[in-house]
UniProtKB/Swiss-Prot annotation:
The gene is nhp6. Keywords: Chromosome, DNA damage, DNA repair, DNA-binding, Nucleus, Transcription, Transcription regulation. Weakly associates with the stable spt16-pob3 heterodimer to form the FACT complex. This is Non-histone chromosomal protein 6. Residues 25-93 bind DNA. GO terms for molecular function: DNA binding. Transmembrane segments: none annotated. One of its GO terms (biological process) is DNA repair. It is found in: Nucleus; Chromosome. DNA-binding protein that induces severe bending of DNA. Required for DNA-binding by the FACT complex, a general chromatin factor that acts to reorganize nucleosomes. The FACT complex is involved in multiple processes that require DNA as a template such as mRNA elongation, DNA replication and DNA repair. Also augments the fidelity of transcription by RNA polymerase III independently of any role in the FACT complex.
Length: 104
């Protein structure tokens, strides 16, 4: 007769994450994300019935095939969005510091 397996489960402590502030600024998009958002619908129209994963794969292949001059407009958009994020983050952090000083 085989022995019964006895196992004990140990409880692991879950690390509580801080809740994300809904008022926090959204991160800037990368050049690839601007390209993907602009071209996703074109890929779906050209390939009806394509799966979500295949759309991403085709977008990645098209991005890699772009020359530097073709990528430049997307990189400029990404740089502008990064600057927007940094500006919003700075003002958001300044507002957070003011709130902490008032509550102290």
């Amino acid at each position: 007769m085989p022995k019964e397996k006895t196992s004990t489960r140990t409880k692991t402590k879950r690390v509580e994450r801080k809740k994300k502030d809904p008022n926090a600024p959204k991160r800037g998009l990368s050049a690839y994300m601007f390209f993907a958002n602009e071209n996703r619908d074109k890929v779906r129209e050209e390939n009806p019935g394509i799966s979500f994963g295949q759309v991403g794969k085709m977008l990645g292949e098209r991005w890699k095939a772009l020359s530097d001059s073709e990528r430049r407009p997307y990189e400029e958009k990404a740089a502008a969005d990064k600057k927007r994020y940094e500006d919003e983050k700075a003002s958001y952090n300044a507002a957070q510091d003011e709130d902490e000083e008032e509550s102290s």
